[in-house]
Amino acid sequence: EASIDLRWGITPDWLLNATINPDFSTVEADNAQLNINNTFALFNREKRPFFLDNQDYFDSDYNLVYTRNINAPNYGAKLTGRENNHAFGLFITDDQNPNILIPGNRSSSVAFIDGESKAAALRYRYSVNNDITLGWISTLRTAENYSNNVNGIDARFRLSTADVFKFQTLFSTTKYPNDLFKQFCNVDEENEQARCATPENNDDCQF
């Protein structure tokens, strides 16, 4: 199938990326990693050009935008840029073979969900001056019977040439499909009773 990629420098400070049916077959393969006796899911470095371009616009103190979970997009669009003291990043994409990370206090797992998913991320930063930066981030992923939304604000204060104070506060809501809820949020075993809450409508399954 034909693949179309667009990289347009609208201005020296603003960049638009778009892709339809992207071909990632030429992207370097991941390095082998051992997951024996590893209770946490493996993280792989992003190597696909669409997601790599201006990736730092979405950075924060936590790894909130992990694009490797987007396996097989049919399309994607991304806008990044700066205007005076403002920095802005937005991307939207779909995924034909979605997987999600199931977090836990002592472990994490990767689970696959049926159907197509949509993913989006928005990041904004404002530099008050050379010493103070304020930011906001929002991510959204939806599929049939699944949704996850994360919102957060952050700030960075340079106190001196050697000291920096940073903080970030986050709020998230998640709804899991019934099959995943039953698989990862069960209280059948006595030692698992403290692991999961059992909220109404499978919302915010909390590990």
Language-model regions, residue ranges each:
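Residues that define the transmembrane beta-barrel architecture of outer-membrane proteins
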Residues: 1-2, 44, 71-75, 82, ...
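Outer-membrane beta-barrel translocator domains and adjoining extracellular loop/strand segments
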Residues: 30-33, 100-107, 145-152, 177-184
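Extracellular loop and loop/strand-boundary signature of outer-membrane beta-barrel proteins
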Residues: 63-64, 102-110, 139-141, 200-202
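Transmembrane beta-strands of outer-membrane beta-barrel pores
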Residues: 20-26, 83-85, 92-96, 138-144, ...
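Repeated loop/turn-to-beta-strand initiation elements of outer-membrane beta-barrel proteins
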Residues: 14-16, 85-90, 130-135, 161-167
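Residue-level signature of outer-membrane beta-barrel architecture
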Residues: 8, 80-83, 125-128, 157-159
